[in-house]
A protein has these predicted regions:
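Short, compositionally biased low-complexity segments
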Residues: 1-12, 62-72, 139-151, 229-235
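Generic detection of long, well-ordered alpha-helical segments
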Residues: 21-28, 81-85, 164-169, 210, ...
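Catalytic cores of NTP-dependent nucleotidyl/adenyl transfer enzymes across multiple folds
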Residues: 23, 29-32, 100, 105-233, ...
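Histidine/cysteine- and/or acidic
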Residues: 22-25, 41, 51, 63-77, ...
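Terminal (often C-terminal) interaction modules
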Residues: 1-8, 36, 80, 231-292
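Short, solvent-exposed polar/charged micro-motifs at secondary-structure junctions
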Residues: 56-62, 113-115, 242
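N-terminal regions immediately upstream of nucleotidyltransferase
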Residues: 1-64, 75-83
Length: 292
């Protein structure tokens, strides 16, 4: 197997299968049916729910992690005068009534529902007729609402993927697999990685996967050397998405060290590949990304 063959195979293995996607949609339909069948809950008739997060952006990898599902409530009929806490409690009550054997718990601002091999995070949201991008979601204390723009990342991600010949999204998935292989999946936020990768490849082009992975490690290593403060801006321009990382010195140091190690291993693999030692190079990349 050549290095390029290995990366093409890796990209394929990280994608969800058709049966997994069908399973996700079937579970979504069970959630939606439970809510729509309740006379106590009023949802928007057209497009009552939609995926968001890494699942909607096609940057989720196998095995499945959390799937974010936004439920569009009819504010005038249902939510007006009710606090987000009341709505969350009502959602959970109706979901539990219809899906009594399905594990679920409140985890503000969402309800986490555990199905076989997947978990949903269900969030009630309020939409606006004059702005398709703007939604209100419950605050973490469930005392009020705050604005969010869940569809905007899909737009810049699509642009970045097109700009890089369709290699951008698969590369993000590879980086996420490297993070998972290094035990960093829980502490390192998925959206942070997507924005960080976009920041890098707004200045570089991805010619192929090995070159793209090298650029990612090299650029992130350089960014950490020259930035002692958060540097990945939020899409809406309010704050930085990597603030959490710089607020945890031990995690920051651990992540920086993993990036440095990844850069060294990638350089070693590429050097072996350039000498025609494809098997050695492939084995190094396998160590980098781990078994699937």
């Amino acid at each position: 197997m050549t290095v390029l063959q290995y990366f093409n195979d890796l990209a394929s293995r990280l994608n969800l299968t058709g049966s997994q996607i069908e399973g996700v949609n079937a579970s979504r339909d069970r959630i939606l049916t439970a809510l729509q069948s309740s006379p106590k809950i009023s949802l928007i008739d057209q497009k009552p729910c939609f995926y968001t997060g890494s699942y909607s952006r096609d940057t989720i990898i196998r095995p499945l992690d959390d799937i974010d599902l936004y439920i569009r409530i009819d504010y005038s009929k249902h939510a007006d005068g009710k606090s987000p806490r009341e709505i969350i409690m009502l959602f959970r009550q109706e979901l539990k009534r219809t899906l009594p054997e399905t594990p679920m718990k409140e985890s503000p601002p969402c309800i986490k529902i555990k199905f076989f091999n997947k978990r949903f995070e269900v969030v009630p949201v309020v939409s606006y007729r004059d702005n398709d991008d703007l939604y209100d979601i419950p605050t973490s204390d469930l005392k009020g609402w705050e604005p969010c723009f869940p569809t905007l990342p899909n737009k810049w991600l699509t642009q970045a993927n097109k700009r890089n010949g369709g290699l951008f999204i698969p590369l993000i998935k590879m980086v996420k697999q490297w993070i998972r292989n290094n035990g960093l999946r829980t502490p390192i936020k998925s959206f942070h990685i997507e924005l960080l990768t976009d920041l890098i490849f707004s200045k570089y082009n991805i010619e192929n996967y090995p070159q793209g992975i090298f650029i990612w490690f090299f650029a992130v290593n350089e960014l950490f050397l020259f930035n002692k403060m958060p540097f990945v801006p939020e899409p809406e321009g309010n704050g930085y998405v990597d603030s959490y990382l710089f607020g945890k010195p031990f995690l920051l140091k651990r992540f920086r060290n993993k990036v440095s190690d990844g850069l060294k291993m990638t350089c070693d693999a590429i050097n072996h590949g350039s000498k025609g030692q494809e098997t050695v190079a492939v084995n190094l990349f396998r160590s980098l990304f781990g078994a699937l």
